């Protein structure tokens, strides 16, 4: 159900201009008035308040409950830009991700919201079901699944943290005053930090630079971490393949298959 534009107008006042923020759900809007700009969203998680307090997302201005029970949140709309792929190898990204992964406040809130730590075995079972559902039996995918099965016992890691689970460069915003934010937290999980580190390093950082990037993040590149990162980026790639196949996104499906081909060569080399 979309946000009621008339209700928003009454909430903010007639002086505010309100327009959709994009996306198919109708759940997000921009509003502006006298140089002030807000980003409005319906039914954001209570997690947003902690992310705002920690300085990880743009500041939460207010939260209001609508007559139908929906909750609208308003955040400062930041003027700035998305990061470019080349920006992802820099220190600011490493330091912000480290801040997220070591935040007790974020972890406590996700636990209060009922999130359970991700189990790699359960993730692999879901992945195999998704592949079976789209009848995708390509030898390359089966090779990838075999790798995940063979190394499952090696990826159990005790220290679970809050993971964003979609660290694509499009989700990192750099404001005009050089403040970095990570947005779009709908898929956040309690998991092995390698779930974020793997996709980020494999997609954005040259392999010879992994050690120096992880040094900025604050840890060493161990063989255990190397394996866990490979495991999670591989599982993510196969999940994307099954998802695009199910949606009938032919171009994205073939692109993901090519990515899997390259990834398997990198992992086994």
From Swiss-Prot:
**What positions carry the motif APH?**
180-203
Cite the effect that the entry attributes to residue 103 to A: Able to complement for the deletion of this protein
The listed locations are: Cytoplasm
Question: Where do the annotations place ATP binding?
Answer: 39, 76-78, 80
Q: What is the effect of changing residue 65 to P?
A: Loss of ability to complement for the deletion of this protein. Loss of native structure
What's the effect of swapping residue 184 to A? Loss of ability to complement for the deletion of this protein
Effect of substituting residue 171 to A: Loss of ability to complement for the deletion of this protein
The regulatory note on its activity is: Activated by D-ribose and 2-deoxy-D-ribose. Slightly activated by kanamycin and gentamicin.
Q: What is the effect of changing residue 47 to A?
A: Loss of ability to complement for the deletion of this protein
Locate the coiled-coil region(s) and give their ranges. none
Q: Which InterPro entries match?
A: Aminoglycoside_PTrfase, CcrZ_PhaseVar_Mediator, Kinase-like_dom_sf
Q: Which controlled-vocabulary keywords does the entry list?
A: ATP-binding, Cell cycle, Cell division, Cytoplasm, DNA damage, DNA replication, Kinase, Nucleotide-binding, Transferase
Active site (record annotation): 166
Organism superkingdom: Bacteria
Q: Which PANTHER family match?
A: CELL CYCLE REGULATOR CCRZ (PTHR40086:SF1), PHOSPHOTRANSFERASE YTMP-RELATED (PTHR40086)
Sequence similarity: Belongs to the aminoglycoside phosphotransferase family.
User: Function, please?
Assistant: Plays a role in cell cycle regulation and chromosome integrity. Activates DnaA-dependent chromosomal DNA replication initiation ensuring that the chromosome is replicated at the right time during the cell cycle. May regulate replication initiation through phosphorylation of a possible second messenger or metabolite, and by interacting with replication initiation proteins. Has ATPase activity with D-ribose and 2-deoxy-D-ribose in vitro, but not with choline. Involved in DNA damage response.
Which protein are we looking at? Answer: Cell cycle regulator CcrZ
Record organism: Bacillus subtilis (strain 168)
């Amino acid at each position: 159900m979309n946000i009621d534009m008339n209700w928003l107008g009454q909430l903010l006042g007639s002086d505010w201009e309100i327009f959709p923020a994009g996306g198919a759900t109708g759940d997000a809007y921009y509003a502006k008035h006298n140089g002030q700009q807000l980003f409005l969203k319906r039914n954001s998680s209570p997690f947003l308040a902690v992310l705002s307090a920690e300085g990880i997302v743009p500041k939460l201005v207010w939260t209001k409950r609508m007559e139908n029970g929906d909750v609208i949140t308003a955040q400062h709309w930041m003027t700035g830009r998305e990061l470019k792929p080349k920006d992802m190898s820099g220190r600011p990204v490493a330091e912000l991700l480290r801040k997220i992964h070591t935040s007790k406040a974020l972890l406590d809130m996700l636990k209060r919201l009922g999130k359970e730590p991700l189990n790699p075995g359960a993730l692999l079972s879901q992945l195999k079901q998704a592949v079976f559902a789209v009848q995708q039996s390509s030898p390359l995918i089966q090779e990838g699944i075999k790798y995940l099965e063979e190394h499952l016992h090696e990826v159990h890691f005790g220290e679970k943290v809050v993971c964003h689970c979609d660290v694509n460069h499009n989700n990192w915003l750099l404001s005009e005053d050089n403040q970095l934010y990570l947005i779009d937290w709908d898929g956040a999980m309690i998991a092995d930090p390698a779930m974020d580190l793997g996709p980020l390093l494999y997609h954005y950082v040259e392999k010879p630079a992994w050690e120096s990037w992880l040094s900025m993040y604050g840890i060493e590149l161990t063989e255990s971490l190397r394996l866990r990162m490979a495991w999670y980026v591989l599982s993510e790639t196969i999940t994307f393949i099954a998802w695009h196949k199910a949606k009938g996104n032919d171009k994205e499906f073939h692109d993901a298959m090519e990515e899997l081909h390259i990834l398997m060569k990198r992992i086994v080399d």
